[in-house]
Each structure stands twice: as structure tokens, then as C-alpha cells.
Amino acid sequence: MKSLSVSLVVLWLLLNWVNSQQNVQQSPESLIVPEGARTSLNCTFSDSASQYFWWYRQHSGKAPKALMSIFSNGEKEEGRFTIHLNKASLHFSLHIRDSQPSDSALYLCAVTLYGGSGNKLIFGTGTLLSVK
């Protein structure tokens, strides 16, 4: 029984170590586009075991709100917004069709990891979008 307890503790520590290694990067840091343009925001992640992939939008002075999520390879479209996910290349992106001034905001990508210490949502650094 003691051996099982030690094994479980080691497994828990390994899962936490793996979770702490996730790195989420966004590009570009900022983007200015004309009204009506097609806009692309990019996100890369370092752990292919990630489960859910999110885009959040935060308007100035407001809390971030979940915009869209995806969990399997391919694309998902909602109105003018499309998410593309390719787990093999550790990349997902948000595409905005017919950009509007109301789309101006900070966009944050995030990755959900499941592990021994619970679920973790790890955010990218953000892309500030200005539509002129």
C-alpha cells in the first residue's frame, strides 16, 4: 500500500511539473487595421496535451469575456469570427471578417490543461487590436 501511495505522489508531482511547463505566446502584440479588413490573431502553445483553446476579448475598462472556444482540430465559425486549431503544429488562430471599430479591444488566447491539481487556464500575453 505504501508503494501505491508513493507512486501516486510521484504521478501528481509529474503532472504538476508538466502543467507548469505550458507556454502560451501570441502574435502580433498590437495590430491596427482599417474598418472592413480581415484580421488574423495567432497563438502558439507548447503542450499538445492541452484540451480546450479559448479566445477572450477585453474592451477598455471592462473584464475579459470568453469570445469563442474549440477543442478539436479544424475550424469553428460564429458570425464574423472563426477559430482555426492545429494541435500537431501547436497553433491556433482567430480570424475576424469585416472588422468593425467595436472589435477594437485586447484579445487574449488561453489554453485549458487538466492535471492532478485541477484545471488550469493559461493565458497568452494579449494582442491589442485597433480598428480605424
Curated annotation (Swiss-Prot):
Gene3D superfamilies to which the protein is assigned, alphabetical: Immunoglobulins
Chain intervals for the UniProt region annotation (V segment): 21-113
Glycoprotein in keyword set: yes
Record region (D segment): 114-117
Record-level GO cellular component terms: T cell receptor complex
Signal peptide per UniProt: 1-20
SUPFAM superfamilies per record: Immunoglobulin (SSF48726)
Annotated CDD domains: IgV_TCR_alpha (cd04983)
J segment as annotated region, ranges: 118-132
Keyword Glycoprotein part of the UniProt annotation: yes
A molecular function GO annotation: peptide antigen binding
UniProt entry keywords in alphabetical sequence: Adaptive immunity, Glycoprotein, Immunity, Immunoglobulin domain, Receptor, Signal, T cell receptor
Pfam families: V-set
GO biological process, one term: adaptive immune response
Glycan-bearing residues: N42
Protein name per the record: T-cell receptor alpha chain V region 2B4
